[in-house]
Amino acid sequence: MDDQRDLISNHEQLPILGQRARAPESNCNRGVLYTSVSVLVALLLAGQATTAYFLYQQQGRLDKLTVTSQNLQLENLRMKLPKSAKPVSPMRMATPLLMRPLSMDNMLQAPVKNVTKYGNMTQDHVMHLLTKSGPVNYPQLKGSFPENLKHLKNSMNGLDWKVFESWMKQWLLFEMSKNSLEEKQPTQTPPKVLTKCQEEVSHIPDVHPGAFRPKCDENGNYMPLQCHGSTGYCWCVFPNGTEVPHTKSRGRHNCSEPLDMEDPSSGLGVTKQDMGQMFL
């Protein structure tokens, strides 16, 4: 009986010992799992931190590049702007130099330059003041008027262009109303100034027997050949109407050739030959 009880008690204790032997194995598996998860989380955090660090460095470099680009643009615009006129320091000269007359030779040889034409106009000062606040808002317009308007429309935002377009409409209406109020005055042709030949012809009618009526060209100058219809004589004249000596006759004349002499009273220059040689 005692032996049976020992066997029963030993048989009942065997499952309990088997169950107690499995507990350390499950605890070991859980420890490995927790360790793996912890290492994975640590690696993820380290990767995120490294990525954030590199992004921060790249952002700093981008900010520096942006600031450098803006500074270069401002420097370029500043170089293109007209320079303000420098104040002229008062001249310090001794009294003998003030009393000495200035030499006109150097002044006549050197071309006169307008030093206030560039960089000292009202438009330049206003442009210089406005470009300090917003240099990008004032582009350089070097094309024709339609091309400049198209460039402005593309460079300006929608609101600014609407404001500018509204201003142009108001300006156009103002110009149209101003032109409509202006009365068109009849254009008065200025009186035509008559030349000496035309004035002489105006005093003589077309048909007047016995009177000499000169002939004028389209510019109002005397024709080189003048003829008197009543007597039949013809002669050559200078452009001012003065008769050329020794050319009056009833024969044919050729006044188109250049004359060898000129009348001093004609105002055309000095005689080419001496008047005394002509009468010889």
UniProtKB/Swiss-Prot annotation:
The modification Phosphoserine is found at S9. One of its GO terms (molecular function) is CD4 receptor binding. Pfam families: MHC2-interact (PF09307), MHCassoc_trimer (PF08831), Thyroglobulin_1 (PF00086). Disulfide bonds join C197-C216, C227-C234, C236-C255. It is a single-pass type II membrane protein. SUPFAM superfamilies: Class II MHC-associated invariant chain ectoplasmic trimerization domain (SSF48305), Thyroglobulin type-1 domain (SSF57610). Keywords: Adaptive immunity, Cell membrane, Chaperone, Disulfide bond, Endoplasmic reticulum, Endosome, Glycoprotein, Golgi apparatus, Immunity, Lysosome, Membrane, Phosphoprotein, Proteoglycan, Secreted, Signal-anchor, Transmembrane, Transmembrane helix. Residues 246-268 are annotated as: Disordered. Residues 194-255 form the Thyroglobulin type-1 domain. GO terms for cellular component: cell surface; cytoplasm; endoplasmic reticulum; endoplasmic reticulum membrane; external side of plasma membrane; extracellular region; Golgi apparatus; late endosome. Residues 57-280 are extracellular. Glycans are attached at N114, N120, S266. It comes from the Eukaryota. It is found in: Cell membrane; Endoplasmic reticulum membrane; Golgi apparatus, trans-Golgi network; Endosome. GO terms for biological process: antigen processing and presentation; antigen processing and presentation of exogenous peptide antigen via MHC class II; canonical NF-kappaB signal transduction; chaperone cofactor-dependent protein refolding; defense response; immunoglobulin mediated immune response; intracellular protein transport; macrophage migration inhibitory factor signaling pathway. The chain crosses the membrane at residues 31-56. Residues 1-30 are cytoplasmic. Nonamer composed of three alpha/beta/gamma heterotrimers. Interacts with CD44; this complex is essential for the MIF-induced signaling cascade that results in B cell survival. Plays a critical role in MHC class II antigen processing by stabilizing peptide-free class II alpha/beta heterodimers in a complex soon after their synthesis and directing transport of the complex from the endoplasmic reticulum to compartments where peptide loading of class II takes place. Enhance also the stimulation of T-cell responses through interaction with CD44. This is H-2 class II histocompatibility antigen gamma chain. It comes from Rattus norvegicus. The gene is Cd74.
